[in-house]
């Protein structure tokens, strides 16, 4: 089980606290320091059953300057997320063949039961 974490993000810290309070202690990966490989991000997207655009933080300045209004393919969007990991939505928990975005944190329980 892996929790993709940004320790500078309050919501990400809250998500990790939520898991720990439920006695769930995943491996923590600080994805801004330990960048995802292309195949890892594709696997996460498959497990989330999401398209790349759905996993992007659209309020980030980099989204507005590099992506908004452009017709990019899914592969191009994935490459942008690898290049600019701040674009990746926070609070992702991967467990086995499933993944979930913890917004709200209670969503984590859907793959832990």
Residue ranges and their predicted role:
Residues 22:
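Conserved dinucleotide-binding and phosphotransfer motif residues
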Residues 33-113:
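Thiol/selenol-based redox catalytic cores and closely related redox-interacting motifs
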Residues 1-18, 26-31:
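Local sequence-structure signature of Cys/Sec-based thiol-disulfide redox active-site neighborhoods
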């Amino acid at each position: 089980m892996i929790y993709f974490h940004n320790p500078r993000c309050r919501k990400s810290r809250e998500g990790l606290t939520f898991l720990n309070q439920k006695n769930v202690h995943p491996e923590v990966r600080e994805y801004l320091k330990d960048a995802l490989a292309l195949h890892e991000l594709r696997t996460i997207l498959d497990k989330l059953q999401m398209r790349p655009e759905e996993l992007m933080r659209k309020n980030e300045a980099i989204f507005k300057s590099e992506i908004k209004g452009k017709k990019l393919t899914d592969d191009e969007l994935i490459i942008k997320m690898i290049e600019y990991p701040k674009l990746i939505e926070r609070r992702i928990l991967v467990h086995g063949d499933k993944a979930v975005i913890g917004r709200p944190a209670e969503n984590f329980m859907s793959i832990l039961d």
